[in-house]
Design a protein with these regions (language model features):
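Conserved beta-propeller blade repeats
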Residues: 1-3, 29-47, 58, 74-95, ...
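Active-site-proximal cap/loop segments of hydrolase catalytic domains
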Residues: 380-584
Length: 584
């Protein structure tokens, strides 16, 4: 099963052989966010929302026929887990205006069997169901840097914390061993990076399975019989896959993958193949399989690239520069093709969201488009606070240190000015979500070094953002940004808010927003647009009525890209498209 978009919205398709034709299975009016196969069956579940509101509903479906909705309208449903035999499904549910989460369990073939089995305040999500259907493994999220693992006994309703003495640890991707006596998870215990561990349920003691790694384990999978282990390492942004036999403890032949980024992987039921998705800088996400004996690496799909010419795609260059305090910051640089070595190109600094995110060398249609169509050099920095470089680096922008990441962009502007093929007088900043906040903040600090800014659904005031973001995510965001109810943090927010410094924004601004955004509400964009316009600064504002936090529908994305192109051409003083020579 693959998710792809041929029409206006992403839907689920089926591919039965490498290079085979895709058969569409879902026909929803809204984009389908993703699908998960139900073990041991020819069925799957998928999730979708309405207009980008992120109140996700879960549907069970076969390869033909109408899907069955398993969830109640008006609720947010996530974190789907199955028992090994596929006869039980679990997920967590949140409701509007409440920070309470509930875990639901039932038979995926019978919506009437689903019932609530546990609830508490704060974010929780199932990870796995035991083979005997007696227990649910779930994670309680404290923040993006801390979580706890629990086993829920379905008969008694009692919970048991796993490794209660571990301290402040982030656990991710947890799953039960087949005998339920241990748990596999990615853990930050006693490490700056996420390591793969096996935790004994009774004692809480863990065994580190990847003790020597200096990078994060990003995901892993284990065969149904708990014999084969495959895990992926985020090595300076690139995914590297390792496969091991857990019984003999020996490493198997390792797949030589194209340099890119992997998100998910899974062993086939007969354990002969490992399936995974892979996205590279010059190819959109595709599905591959690798024979565990090391014989063959097979590409199943070849995704289309729209109107982009594969021959003209840019391979990003990894660069590093020093920031104001000596901290090294990395960035990916996409340079346009066919540009003379001494020609100074305009620059777009594209700052990722999160802030606990990372720009990686996966398919980036925006960077490729701006390099190919605008002839711009696109720089994507991983400022402090980014993940992928250890917990210490990720914590460098917390709370009162928020603007240190903005200073990293000041250092990047210095680096740009020192490059012989970059035009320091034609630099724009671009970002979405938290990157939108960064775009606004950079515009208040470095307006004299920019020609303008593009920001999409960015935070303009942390205090109003925390007040108005959906209740189910508010405490998690407070753990990252700080608590607006604390007078000390309230003073920090007042000082650093782009809205409070809007008079310093003196260059043209393009703002885009989804009307149904539950994360960064439309009010954040409304207020900053009003503030900039009140000062007489040119401000373009585009609101999509049927989108949320991100734009998923093709007509809306086509319009977004066209507006951005017109706006940036104006900033860069490009009256017509860049020619083959790279000159106007």
């Amino acid at each position: 099963l693959i998710a792809t978009r041929f029409g206006s919205t992403q839907q689920i398709h089926r591919v039965t052989m490498p290079g085979g034709a895709r058969t569409q299975i879902t026909f929803q009016s809204e984009p389908v966010a993703g699908a998960t196969a139900i073990p041991g069956t020819q069925r799957f579940v998928f999730v979708r929302d309405t207009g980008g509101d992120e109140w996700f509903q879960i549907y069970a479906s076969g390869l033909t026929g109408a899907p069955q909705q398993l969830t109640e309208a008006g609720t947010r449903n996530q974190s789907i887990a199955f028992s090994p035999d596929g006869q039980r499904i679990a997920w967590s549910r949140a409701t509007k205006g409440s920070g309470e989460y509930a875990i639901y369990v039932g038979d995926p073939a019978d919506a009437r069997s689903v019932k609530s089995v546990y609830r508490e305040q704060g974010s929780i999500g199932p990870d796995d169901i035991s083979a005997d259907h007696a227990q649910v493994l779930f994670t309680r999220g404290i923040s993006n840097r801390e979580s706890k693992l629990f086993l829920l006994d379905l008969a008694s309703g009692k919970t048991q914390e796993i490794a209660p003495k571990a301290g402040k640890v982030l656990y991710t991707n947890a799953r039960l061993a087949r005998d339920s006596r241990s748990v596999y998870a990615i853990s930050t215990k006693d490490s700056d990076f996420g390591r793969l561990v096996q935790i004994d349920v009774a004692s809480g003691k863990d065994t580190v399975l990847t003790p020597d790694l200096k990078w994060d384990v990003e995901t892993f999978t284990i065969s149904d019989d708990d014999r084969l282990l495959a895990y992926s390492i985020n090595e300076d942004g690139f995914s590297k896959v390792v496969v091991r036999d857990l019984v003999t403890r020996r490493a198997l032949p390792q797949p030589e993958l194209p340099r890119g980024v992997l998100q998910t992987m899974q062993f086939s039921p007969d354990k002969t193949k490992l399936a995974f998705d892979l996205s590279t800088a010059t190819s959109a996400g595709d599905v591959w399989t690798w024979d565990v004996d090391g014989a063959n690496l097979t590409r199943w799909t070849t995704s289309e690239l729209g109107g982009l010419d594969p021959a003209k795609l840019a391979e990003p260059q990894l660069v590093r520069f020093k920031s104001f305090d000596g901290q090294t910051v990395s960035a990916l640089v996409y340079r346009p093709a066919g540009i003379a070595a001494d020609f100074r190109t305009p620059v777009i600094m594209d700052i990722h969201g999160g802030p606990e995110g990372q720009t990686r060398p996966s398919w980036n249609v925006g960077a490729q488009y701006f390099a190919g169509v605008l002839g711009a050099t696109v720089i994507l920095p991983n400022v402090r606070g980014s993940t992928g470089y250890g917990r210490r680096y990720a914590d460098l922008d917390n709370a009162e240190k928020r603007e240190d990441s903005v200073k990293d962009i000041g250092a990047l502007l210095d680096w740009i000015a020192a490059q012989p093929n970059l035009d320091k007088n034609r630099v724009a900043v671009y970002g979405q979500s938290y990157g939108g906040y960064m775009s606004l903040a950079v515009s208040t600090h470095f307006a004299d070094r920019l020609v303008g800014s593009v920001e999409r659904y960015g935070i303009s005031d942390f205090a109003s953002f925390l007040k108005n973001t959906e209740a189910y995510r508010r405490d998690n965001r407070r753990a990252e940004y700080g608590d607006e109810r604390d007078p000390k943090m309230a003073a920090v927010f007042k000082r650093i808010a782009p809205l409070a410094n809007v008079a310093k924004i003196t260059k043209p601004m393009l703002v885009m927003q989804g009307a149904n955004d539950p994360r960064v509400p439309k009010s954040e964009s409304d207020q900053v647009v009003a503030g900039i316009r009140a000062n007489g600064v040119e401000t373009w504002y585009v609101v999509f009525a049927d989108e949320g936090h991100g734009f998923l529908k093709k007509p809306n994305n086509d319009l977004r890209r066209e507006v951005e192109t017109v706006f940036l051409r104006k900033l860069f003083k490009q009256p017509r498209p860049i020619g083959e020579s790279g000159q106007d």
